[in-house]
Amino acid sequence: MRLDGQIPDLGRVGVWSWSLVDQPAPQVRRAVAAFEAMGYRAAWFPESRGREAFTTSALILSATERLAAVTGIANIWARDPDAAASGANALGEAWPGRFVLGLGVSHAPSVARRGGDYARPLAKMRDYLGRIEGATFMGPPADPPVPVILAALGPQMLRLAASRTGGAHPYFVPVEHTRIAREALGSGPWLAPEQAVVVASDPGRARELARKHMSGYLRLDNYRRNLLRLGWNEAELEDGGSDAVVDAIVAWGDADTVAERIRQHLAAGADHVGIQVLSDEPFPLNDLEALADRLL
């Protein structure tokens, strides 16, 4: 399987949603059809303990006509490289130009739960990419080839993304990281950070939702190390993050204010931003429509 497939035109923004993997299939079908009707061209989703990544992709693609499914990310510990190449080719052949395979090394606790050893994640990813590239697929090939991107935060994974794949998908990052990532990648590779947002102007309510979202991530070494690299200190990362950390990671305010943060990522070098709306609703369609009106 090739690793240099061209990224389709996904527009400047897409929808990033955990609910695509943890809500019932009928609700997912209705939601992605609504995303497409609003003008979004990409639906992003993770892979952890919810619906499996390739199954989720097929669900999204079968319920829409133009929307792309982008794994953000497919966990490389969840399947061997041959299985990943087979699944990607099958999706790319069935829905040409509408699937992007984002791959990631996950996190030590999740890897341990699967019985793996997280000791050398960069080497693991490098080996995985080589084995995907060498995989033999006996079915009809995807045309165009399925593009591959990497979840990348630190300089070494960003360099690997630039040298071996189509680009990078940083998650849980401020705008400052997008500038750093673009410099590390160079001008060619695709850069698509995720941006969590709360469309609410009350600081207390907005930060409450933000901290609920952030608290688990701030216990994971990968995200903590990245924020420490960016200049925060350990104390600022405790208890769901200081106000300054919260405000850097989660954009909040009215739709105009939130849209401005997305534009800052684009100005900093992003080609595309996956917008994750934090809400009590699984699919906050009104907020997504308000942002679509301002960004699409």
Question: Where are the model-predicted features located?
Answer:
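Active-site-adjacent structural elements that line small-molecule/cofactor binding pockets in enzymes
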Residues: 1-296
